[in-house]
Amino acid sequence: MRSTEPAIFGAVITHTRAVLIETVGRDAYETALRKLPEADADLYARANALDWVPVRVIEAVAVACAEVVGRDAMTLNDEVSRLGSRRAFGSVWRAFLRFTSDEALMTRGPTIFGKTYSHGRVRPEFSGQGTATIHLEWPSAPELVVRTLGIASEELLAAGGRERIRIVTERARGGAVYRCSWRE
C-alpha cells in the first residue's frame, strides 16, 4: 500500500540500501542508523521489496551516513543514486535499451517514475533527435528526488547507448524541468 506521505518503493530501496552500505561501509551505515529515531531506522533497515519508505526517512539516512563518513549528504546520495541506477539499467536492460529509439527511451520515464515514487508525475517532451525536456510535476518535490531523477535519466540514456549526455536541471513552479541532450 502506498504511503500518504511521499515515499519510494521498497524494491528500489533494497537495491539502493545495498549500494549505500557498499559505498560507506557496514560500520558507518549501522552507526548512522543509530542516530535516527528507532522507528525510522527500523523502517529503512527492514524495508522489503513491497514496502513504501517515506522520502523523509531516506533523506535522514543520507544525512546521517554523510555525517558519519564526513561527506556532503546530497553528494553522497548522488553517488549512490548514480551507481544504483547504472547497475539497474546496466543489467539485462542494457541490451534492450540499445535498440530503442530516442523517443521510446524518453517515454519510459513516466512508467519508471510512477512505479518508484508515490507522489508526483513525470511528463517527457521529445524535442527531436538527441534532445528532450522532462517535466517533474510535483510542486514540493524534495531536493533528493529532484537530483535523483536527473541522475537516473542520465543513466537510462547511457544504458541506451547515448553519449555526451547533458542534463540541466531547473526548479520550476510545478516541480522541476530537465533539459536533456545527447548523441548516439
Where do the language-model regions lie?
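Short, internal active-site loops enriched in acidic
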Residues: 38, 139, 172-175
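Short secondary-structure junctions
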Residues: 41, 123-124, 163-168
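Beta-rich nucleic-acid/ligand-interaction surfaces
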Residues: 166-184
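Amphipathic interaction/junction segments at domain boundaries or subunit interfaces
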Residues: 47-148, 169
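Short, non-transmembrane amphipathic alpha-helical segments
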Residues: 147-162
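Short beta-strand or tight-loop elements
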Residues: 118-120, 161-163, 174
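N-terminal leader/assembly segments
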Residues: 1-71
